[in-house]
A protein has these predicted regions:
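Conserved N-terminal beta-strand and adjoining loop/helix that marks the start
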Residues: 1-13, 33
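A structural signal for short, well-ordered beta-strand segments
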Residues: 4, 44, 76-79
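A conserved beta-turn-beta hairpin within the catalytic core of GNAT-like acetyltransferases
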Residues: 21-25
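The catalytic Nudix box helix
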Residues: 29-61, 100
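Active-site-adjacent beta-strand/loop module that shapes the phosphate/pyrophosphate-binding cleft
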Residues: 55-56, 64-87, 95-103, 120
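Charged phosphate-binding loop/patch that engages nucleotide di/tri-phosphates or the phosphate backbone
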Residues: 112-123
Length: 123
C-alpha cells in the first residue's frame, strides 16, 4: 500500500475517510493498493488521480514502512501536485485539510499513517 504526503507551501494535505466504518471520520495520507505489476510510484500517481482528481509526482519516499495486518505494508512518499487541484470525492473522503507542521496533531490520524508524521514535520 502507498500513501501520499502531498506538500504545498509548507503544508501537507490530510484526507478524512468516509469508509470503512472503523476508519470513517479519521484522517490519512490518501493512497491505496499497488496492483500486480505496478511500481509503487505508478500506483501512487494512479490512486491520487482516482481519489482526488489531480496529477502528482513523487518527490521522495519517506523512510520506513508500516505493517497493515498480515498481508500489507504502507509506504508514504512526499509528492507535489503537477496538474489540477485535489478535491474530496465522497466515495473515499468527505473533507481535505492543508495542515502546517504545527497542526499535524490537530486531526485524528489513522494509526498506520502516524509514524510518518515526524518525517513530514521535519520535511
Amino acid at each position: 500500500m502507498v500513501g501520499a504526503a502531498i506538500v504545498r507551501d509548507g503544508r501537507v494535505l490530510a484526507a478524512r475517510r468516509t469508509s470503512p466504518p472503523e476508519a470513517a471520520g479519521r484522517w490519512e495520507f490518501p493512497g491505496g493498493k499497488v496492483e500486480s505489476g505496478e511500481s509503487p510510484g505508478t500506483a501512487l500517481v494512479r490512486e491520487i488521480r482516482e481519489e482526488l482528481g489531480c496529477t502528482v509526482e513523487v518527490v521522495a519516499w519517506l523512510p520506513g514502512e508500516v505493517a497493515i495486518g498480515e498481508r500489507h505494508t504502507l509506504r508514504v512518499a512526499l509528492v507535489r501536485v503537477v496538474e489540477g487541484e485535489p478535491q474530496a470525492r465522497e466515495h473515499e473522503h468527505d473533507a481535505l485539510r492543508w495542515l502546517a507542521a504545527t497542526e499535524l496533531g490537530d486531526v485524528d490520524w489513522l494509526e498506520p499513517d502516524r509514524p510518518f508524521l515526524e518525517h513530514v514535520r521535519l520535511g
